[in-house]
């Protein structure tokens, strides 16, 4: 597939910043090239040297874990950096548009607004699936990006895979962004495995959820190598700090924690759902393929405030279209989930 028409001409022609670590990649020698402090950092660990701008050690690990090649991986300061760079790479304000399918992750809209890009919204159906016909009717020659979040946030469900395939095969003027932030909690295979067949796909994932590394802010984009080269071309030169790279490398070297965490969260998700089903104030618990559930409650706003007073924090989604009177609940450890059930039971029995 020819990506050239999807990318803004000045991005193709851009001469990127060349950092000191781009020009010399060796680890041994006397380094007088980057204006670093030769005395160290004054800390136990030495952070005075700039980090690898392409994070190759981490990418080698991820290539094995994700069954892809190193040149198909981009690492960003959270997935939000990848979202922003993709928009700036493809969309010109006043010319191009993107398609969003609310309710969905809010940063797509925020990033588009910051970049002054037209947003066309095609709401999910009542069962939180894609309105394929509506999306296809909304696409025009200036549509550059279609954002799909699966499993979806804030609803928790995975999108029908057949619908995603239909859109990927029908959308000819831009990229389909598939946000898989919660894929580790789903039995659905990642679309990373489809990159060779569908080079117009960009898949996003994160280490913030299943890997428990939210504080480090490391997001991943997986795409055709030519797209990864462009993302690396326009990113800040050292967008992933050295401390983050070291910690992530250690975490990825011990995959058992992630696997055990996922199994525990899935088990607790099932247990919490069964407990909530017994409470009269619960109207509906929506299907979840994530580490959270969306629950439709009677008097959801009052319940949310009651939980806040008890210092149990959930996310009130009642103001979001199609999520009226609903609260998003992250799956906690067993004691936290038991406390939640106890408080909700007390609220509706009072």
Model-identified regions with their sequence ranges:
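PLP-dependent enzyme catalytic core of the Aspartate aminotransferase-like
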Residues: 162, 309-310, 319-350
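Active-site pre-lysine segment of PLP-dependent enzymes
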Residues: 113, 132-141, 154-176, 180-213
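Short, conserved charged micro-motifs
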Residues: 43, 299-306, 336-339
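Phosphate-binding glycine-rich loop
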Residues: 56-97, 115
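PLP-dependent aminotransferase class I/II
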Residues: 200-278, 285
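Conserved PLP-binding catalytic core of the aspartate aminotransferase-like
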Residues: 265-266, 278-310
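PLP-dependent aminotransferase-like
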Residues: 92-148
């Amino acid at each position: 597939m020819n990506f050239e028409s999807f990318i803004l001409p000045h991005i193709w022609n851009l001469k990127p910043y060349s950092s000191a670590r781009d020009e010399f990649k060796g680890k041994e020698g006397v380094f007088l090239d980057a204006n670093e402090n030769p005395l160290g950092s004054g800390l136990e660990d030495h952070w005075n040297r700039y980090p690898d701008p392409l994070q190759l050690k981490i990418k080698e690990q991820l290539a094995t874990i994700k069954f892809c090649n190193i040149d198909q991986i981009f690492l960003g300061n959270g997935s939000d950096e990848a979202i922003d760079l993709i928009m700036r790479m493809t969309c010109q304000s006043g010319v191009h548009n993107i398609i969003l399918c609310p309710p969905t992750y809010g940063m797509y809209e925020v990033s588009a607004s910051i970049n002054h890009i037209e947003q066309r919204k095609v709401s999910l159906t009542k069962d939180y699936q894609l309105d394929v016909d509506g999306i296809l009717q909304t696409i025009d020659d200036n549509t550059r990006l279609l954002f799909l979040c699966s499993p979806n946030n804030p609803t928790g469900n995975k999108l029908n895979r057949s619908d995603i395939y239909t859109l990927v095969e029908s959308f000819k003027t831009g990229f389909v962004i598939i946000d898989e932030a919660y894929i580790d909690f789903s039995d659905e295979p990642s679309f990373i495995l489809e990159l060779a067949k569908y080079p117009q796909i960009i898949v996003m994932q994160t280490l913030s959820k299943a890997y428990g590394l939210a504080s480090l802010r490391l997001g991943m984009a997986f795409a055709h190598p030519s797209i990864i080269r462009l993302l690396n071309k326009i990113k800040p030169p050292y967008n992933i700090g050295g401390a983050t790279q070291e910690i992530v490398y250690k975490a990825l070297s011990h995959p058992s924690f992630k696997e055990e965490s996922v199994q525990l969260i899935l088990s607790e998700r099932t247990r919490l759902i069964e407990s909530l089903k017994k409470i009269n104030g619960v109207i509906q618990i929506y299907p979840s393929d994530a580490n959270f559930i969306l629950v439709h409650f009677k008097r959801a706003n009052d319940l949310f405030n009651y939980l806040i007073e008890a210092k149990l924090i959930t996310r009130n989604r009642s103001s979001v279209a199609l999520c009226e009177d609903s609260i998003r609940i992250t799956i906690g450890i067993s004691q936290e989930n038991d406390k939640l059930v106890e408080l909700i039971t007390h609220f509706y029995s009072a």
